[in-house]
């Protein structure tokens, strides 16, 4: 009876680990198995963001915000936890390549007509699927590719957060400049309106011109309010990016907009190979490699599975004699099963994996094109905005000369104070335009930094 019991358990082990297999006609999808470099997590997260680039802005406040974001940003913490989660998935899948051993304790009580008695059993069951086709190791490699992809996602997140912090900070300093100049413009427009109000009372200025001056003053105040509102919103955004409370924005120091400048070098052209260091490009490669491995696994599901099983069973009426040699039995067995009919499941699974591979291939091609587009777009923005800034600085120089001449005329009594104020307002508007373009250029540098994966600059 015990022998029959042990054989039944071993047979059930063999059946439970058997894999259905049927003949499958190959589809027309050509699967190319690529091999990429292994990716491992780094303990120095600062390597992701290339701090040398940020030091090119020569701004200690910006550098401090970048470091603060790397240490406290919640998205980055979640990205790091995702890596650990996927690593545990790899460990769990790798365990399927090893034998499993289970133990149990089965107390019982029975009466078969000869008197009641107790019974105790302790089974030890071992099973192992022989990975002679490499199917389980392929499954482990497939899960490992997801883990490596999560590492690349973390790198992409670090670059993205650093870029967001830099762009947000520069736009805040840009608004500092706009607000400073706008306050001077509003002050001048108020003076112009007050002077025109006096002139209108004396009949020297028409009511229509007075209304226009008042409209310009009110519009200037409205623009100033919008600028302050946008700056507060950006400060809130910077606080969240750095893992801080938006209630602390009054403590956020910035550089003087008159001195902030980028001393780094951005090339006018770049080789197309630069996209190969972007984390999204590398991830697309990993996912394509994973899809190829999944097709391998699906093909190997067609093959029979070979399993080994073992049983040691201790069975006695008294618990004290449970582990005696005469109460034990053991057995070894194996199984090889190749079912004839599986309802088309294996064939459908293989086709599904090939479709997934083709989707990964198309995504890889798309990422390739999108990466080149983003690099080219960033270079066009850098070069064109530099050219625009150069022209605007020429206009600024001419406007400054014109204003100096106007001041001389006013000092000589040739023109009125109203004319001088209007000319000064024009100069301030041009200064706003130039500062805006300067900061737009610096934001373009950050876009290029992000487009090339924060590596080659």
Q: Model-predicted segments: where are they?
A:
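Amphipathic alpha-helical coiled-coil segments
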Residues: 78-93, 157, 161-184, 188-198, ...
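Gram-negative bacterial Sec-dependent N-terminal signal peptides
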Residues: 1-18
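Small/polar (Gly/Ser/Thr/Ala-rich) solvent-exposed segments
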Residues: 77, 97-119, 127-156, 160, ...
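Metallo-beta-lactamase
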Residues: 227, 279-280, 360, 437
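Short, solvent-exposed, mixed-charge loop/turn linkers that connect secondary-structure elements
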Residues: 206, 225-275, 416, 443-457
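Transmembrane beta-barrel architecture of outer-membrane proteins
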Residues: 62-64, 78, 119-121, 167, ...
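Bacterial Sec-pathway N-terminal export signals of envelope proteins
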Residues: 19-89, 259-289, 339-340, 368, ...
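Membrane-embedded beta-strand positions in outer-membrane beta-barrel channels/transporters
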Residues: 66, 123-125, 169, 271, ...
């Amino acid at each position: 009876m015990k022998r029959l019991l042990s054989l039944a358990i071993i047979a059930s082990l063999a059946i439970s680990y058997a894999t259905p297999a049927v003949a499958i006609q190959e589809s027309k999808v050509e699967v190319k198995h690529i091999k990429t470099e292994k990716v491992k997590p780094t303990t120095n997260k600062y390597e992701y963001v290339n701090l040398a680039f940020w030091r090119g802005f020569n701004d200690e406040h910006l550098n401090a915000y970048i470091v603060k974001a790397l240490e406290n940003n919640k998205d980055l913490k979640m990205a790091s936890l995702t890596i650990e989660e996927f690593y545990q998935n790899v460990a769990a899948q790798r365990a399927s390549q090893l034998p499993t051993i289970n133990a149990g304790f089965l107390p019982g009580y029975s009466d078969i007509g000869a008197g009641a008695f107790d019974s105790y059993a302790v089974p030890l069951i071992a099973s192992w699927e022989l990975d002679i086709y490499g199917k389980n190791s392929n499954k482990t490699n497939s899960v490992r590719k997801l883990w490596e992809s999560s590492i690349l996602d973390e790198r992409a997140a670090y670059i993205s957060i650093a870029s967001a912090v830099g762009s947000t900070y520069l736009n805040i300093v840009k608004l500092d400049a706009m607000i400073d100049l706008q306050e001077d413009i509003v002050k001048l427009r108020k003076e112009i309106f007050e002077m025109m109000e006096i002139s209108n009372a004396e009949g020297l200025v028409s009511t229509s011109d007075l209304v226009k001056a008042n409209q310009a003053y009110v519009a200037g105040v409205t623009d100033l309010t919008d600028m302050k509102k946008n700056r507060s919103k950006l400060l809130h955004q910077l606080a969240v990016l750095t893992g801080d409370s938006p209630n602390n924005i009054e403590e956020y120091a910035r550089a003087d907009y008159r001195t902030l400048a980028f001393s780094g070098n951005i090339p006018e052209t770049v080789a197309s190979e630069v996209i190969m260091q972007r984390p999204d490009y590398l991830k697309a490669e990993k996912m394509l490699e994973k899809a190829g491995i999944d097709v391998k696994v699906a093909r190997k599901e067609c093959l029979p599975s070979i399993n080994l099983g073992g049983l040691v069973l201790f069975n006695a009426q008294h618990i004290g004699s449970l582990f005696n040699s005469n109460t034990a039995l053991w057995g070894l067995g194996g199984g090889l099963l190749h079912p004839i009919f599986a309802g088309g499941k294996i064939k459908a699974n293989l086709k599904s994996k090939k479709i997934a591979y083709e989707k990964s291939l198309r995504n890889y091609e798309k990422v390739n094109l999108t990466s080149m587009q983003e690099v080219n777009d960033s270079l066009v923005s850098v070069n064109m905005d530099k050219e625009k800034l150069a022209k605007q600085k020429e206009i600024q120089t001419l406007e400054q000369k014109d204003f100096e001449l106007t001041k001389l005329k006013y000092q000589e009594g040739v023109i009125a104070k109203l004319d001088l104020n209007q000319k000064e307002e024009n100069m301030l508007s041009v200064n706003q335009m130039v500062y805006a373009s300067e900061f737009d250029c610096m934001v373009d540098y950050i876009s290029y930094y992000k487009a090339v994966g924060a590596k080659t600059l």
